[in-house]
C-alpha cells in the first residue's frame, strides 16, 4: 500500500471503510476500500463474493475493481473513484430531479442490471448509497451481497436497506431472484422523482404496511405465494384498497408512474426484466446498445479490465495475481485497429516485407513530367506498404530513366501500336507482398488510336 496516499475517508459501512487516495506512481485518483475483518490467506480473499462477482463483470456502468491487496492481514480493494453517490445528491437537493435526469441515470442502471442478470448475478443491495455518480455517468457499486442466480438456497434473510427491500424478502422467503433488484429500482426511481422515500417503513411489519398503503394489499389473484409466505410466519396483510401510486406522485408523467407500478408489483414474476424495462415508453428516445456491440462500435468508452490483484507472501514479499479477463469482447485495441483501416493482413504483410532485404525500385526521372504510372493506392501508415507496378506510357519523345531496377533491366524495347495490347515478353515476377502484376492492375484498358510510339529503356 506504499504506492497509495490516503487523502480522506469518504464512507464507512458494516464491512469496511472507503477512502479517497492517490496512486503516487501515476497520480491517478482511486477509491480504497479497507475491510474491517482480517484475512490470513490470499485464497480466502479471492473467494469473497464481491471479488468473484466484480472479476466476472466489465461494463461501463459497473464500478471497476483495479486491484486486491492483502497487507499485514488487512484486505484492500483498489477501485475506480467516483465523485459522490446518489444519496448525497438527493440529500442536498431542494427540488426533485427532472425526468430527463432520472431517465438518463436509470437507463444506465438498467443497462448495467441487464448485463449483470444475463451473466447470472443479481445485486441484492440496490440503494442510493450504492449508485455512484460522476457528472452524468452513474455506476453500480458495492457487490458485497451480490449472488449468483445458480446459488443454492436458502439465501440470507438480510438483504438491502429496508426501504428498498422486496416484499418476498420482507416475508423471509429463502428463494428469490433478480426480481428483487427490479423492486428496488422502482423505489429508487420514485424517490428521485419526488425526493421522498416511497416506502419508509420503520420495521419489517411497518414496511409492508407502507407498501399496502401505496399499491394496495395482495390477494389470491395478485400474489398467492405471498399469502402463503405470510401464513407461514403468522402474518396477516392489512386490508387496504390500493393502486394510489398516481396520487402519491402527482407531478410525475404517466409513463414514469406506469413503469414504477410494474416494477413494484407484489408478484416477482410480474415484474419486468431489466432488458424489458429498457424498451418501456419512459425511455423512448434512449438507444440501447448491448455491451458487446458497444465495445466494437466505440459508442461508449470501454472500461479497462482489472489490472491485477496483489498479496503478501509468507516472506513479506508482494505477489501479484491476474484477475483475468473481464469480458469476452474484443480488446479496445482491436476496435481502434479496425477504425483506422489497418487490417490484420496488411500488418502481417508489412512484417513479412520488413524481414526481407528487397532491392528498392527508385522513381524514374521524367523529362517532361507527363509519365503516367499505374499503382496501388498507398497509405502512409504501418501495415500498408507502398506497392508499385512499373508500367508507363511514353510521350512522343524518348524518356530517359536512370538507375533502372533489376525488373526493368530484363525488359527490352517495347512498342505499342494502335488498338493493340502489347505485353512484355518475359513474365514479370511476383511482387514481394505475394501479389502478381495482373492482380494489382486488374483489367488493362486499351490505348486509344495514335501513331506508332516507341519507348526505350536505357540502363
From Swiss-Prot:
Entry-annotated residues carrying Phosphoserine:
151
| Residues at the active site | 125
What is one GO cellular-component annotation here? nucleus
Q: Which residues bind ATP?
A: 10-18, 33
Keyword ATP-binding included in the entry's annotation: yes
Known EC number: 2.7.11.22, 2.7.11.23
Keyword Kinase annotated? yes
Q: What domain of life?
A: Eukaryota
Kindly list the residue ranges recorded as spanning the membrane.
none
Q: Which family does it belong to?
A: Belongs to the protein kinase superfamily. CMGC Ser/Thr protein kinase family. CDC2/CDKX subfamily.
What name has this protein been given in UniProt?
Cyclin-dependent kinase F-4
